């Protein structure tokens, strides 16, 4: 199987793009095939070079390694050859209408209760205007294909306009170059969102017009949506870059997206085993909702299940004993580093805010003489409760505030052994000043 992922560098890759890339990548690898990355950069008015670089960064971060990378901007000669062939066969024709004239025609058709469809007619040449070009569809032919996820799909193109393939400025639209590249790269399976179903019907006619005898198989995935609505580059907030900057692990994004909408459930241990992957396990339901809270929760699970040795390089000087003490109560690696700094250095705290000063004084009066361990911390809390009649929860909250400057975090009994008794006493007194 040869698959491809074809992002357009007009924005950052979001979760929906990444899911398509991952599924196409795993489909290729599970079959022993090839995965091709194609940069769709023909629309010079919208693309930005910075987004090209970020596509590579995001895919590399996700562990996606292409077998071949092509850029459409470097393949225009191939497209020009295809255009010559289609002109010779009469399937591409010039048009001269301005956008304003097309809008007038559209309104006229609607006013007569007719579909606003652009078809080839005896359209006059225009001596002073540059032409743009359309591909002539066969409107009387119903396009049928067997989708790998949705089964039989039937599209009637009677109400579809002939698509524009070359703009007035000579640049290509998405439709034709995509087909030319799929033929030239021998793509066997095209995996993409369900919003491309109508494009597929049009492109099947393009494949045929170019003499392609082995048209790729298609798998149209349900679109991802957020709880707040549709996912898109324009809406933002769900980009891979954003999750990376928020310290979500790449394994978490991969596992979450690969499991989303699938009948089978992979784990961190086995999701990279390509032999477990089956494209047909994915649902063809109309949409799949992304719950960002689940991603952050899954990140915490990943850290909890990770071995110290696997993360040691990224943990800096954090000791294994500290990692084991806090890993069940943190959601990101920077959070581990943060708590390590609080516990082992003279970190700048603001512990006095919100503390019960009398409780802190009472806590100082019964602070054990030995270095604090899990057991001595529990005994210390019990002494404060028994001697001064405080609620145990209140004691925990105030000790946490005084000693860490925070209202939440890892279990106090787990982290206090990493704060020396001397530092504990200093912080308790500082919280009173």
Swiss-Prot record:
A motif ('KMSKS' region) lies at residues 230-234. One of its GO terms (biological process) is glutamyl-tRNA aminoacylation. Gene3D superfamilies: 1.10.10.350, HUPs. It catalyses: tRNA(Glu) + L-glutamate + ATP = L-glutamyl-tRNA(Glu) + AMP + diphosphate. GO terms for cellular component: cytoplasm. Pfam families: tRNA-synt_1c (PF00749). Transmembrane segments: none annotated. Monomer. Belongs to the class-I aminoacyl-tRNA synthetase family. Glutamate--tRNA ligase type 1 subfamily. This is Glutamate--tRNA ligase 1. It comes from Neorickettsia sennetsu (strain ATCC VR-367 / Miyayama). The gene is gltX1.
């Amino acid at each position: 199987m040869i698959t491809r992922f074809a992002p357009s560098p007009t924005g950052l890759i979001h979760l929906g793009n990444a899911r398509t890339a991952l599924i196409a990548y795993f489909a290729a690898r599970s079959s022993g095939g090839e995965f091709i990355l194609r940069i769709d950069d023909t629309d010079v008015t919208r693309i930005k070079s910075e987004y090209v670089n970020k596509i590579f960064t995001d895919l590399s971060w996700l562990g996606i390694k292409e077998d071949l990378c092509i850029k459409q901007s470097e393949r225009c000669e191939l497209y020009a050859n295809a255009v010559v062939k289609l002109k010779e066969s009469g399937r591409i024709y010039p048009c001269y209408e301005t956008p304003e004239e097309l809008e007038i025609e559209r309104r006229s058709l609607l006013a007569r209760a007719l579909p606003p469809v652009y078809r080839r007619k005896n359209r006059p040449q225009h001596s002073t205007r540059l032409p743009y070009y359309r591909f002539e569809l066969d409107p009387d032919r119903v396009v049928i294909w067997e989708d790998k996820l949705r089964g039989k799909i039937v599209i009637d193109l009677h109400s579809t306009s002939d698509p524009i393939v070359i703009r007035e400025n000579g640049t290509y639209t998405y439709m034709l170059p995509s087909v030319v590249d799929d033929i030239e790269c021998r793509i066997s399976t095209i995996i993409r969102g369900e919003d491309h179903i109508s494009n597929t019907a049009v492109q099947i006619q393009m494949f045929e017009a170019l003499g392609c005898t082995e048209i790729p198989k298609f798998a149209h995935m349900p679109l991802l949506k957020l709880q707040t609505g549709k996912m898109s580059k324009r809406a933002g907030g769900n980009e891979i870059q954003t999750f990376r900057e928020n310290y979500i692990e790449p394994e978490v994004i991969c596992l979450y997206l690969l499991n989303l909408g699938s009948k089978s459930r992979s784990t961190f241990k086995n999701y990279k085993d390509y032999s477990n992957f089956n494209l047909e396990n994915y649902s063809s339901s109309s949409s799949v909702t992304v719950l960002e809270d689940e991603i952050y929760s899954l990140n915490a699970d990943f850290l909890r299940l990770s071995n110290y040795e696997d993360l040691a390089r990224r943990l800096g000087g954090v000791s294994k004993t500290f990692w084991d003490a806090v890993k069940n109560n943190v959601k990101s690696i920077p959070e581990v580093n943060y708590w390590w700094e609080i516990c082992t250095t003279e970190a700048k705290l603001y512990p006095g805010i919100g503390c019960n000063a009398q409780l802190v004084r009472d806590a100082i009066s019964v602070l054990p003489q030995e270095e604090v361990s899990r057991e001595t911390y529990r005994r210390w809390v019990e002494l404060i409760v028994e001697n001064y009649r405080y609620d145990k929860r209140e004691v925990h909250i105030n000790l946490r505030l005084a000693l860490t400057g925070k209202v939440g975090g890892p279990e106090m009994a787990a982290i206090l052994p990493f704060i020396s008794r001397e530092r504990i006493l200093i912080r308790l007194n500082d919280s009173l000043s």
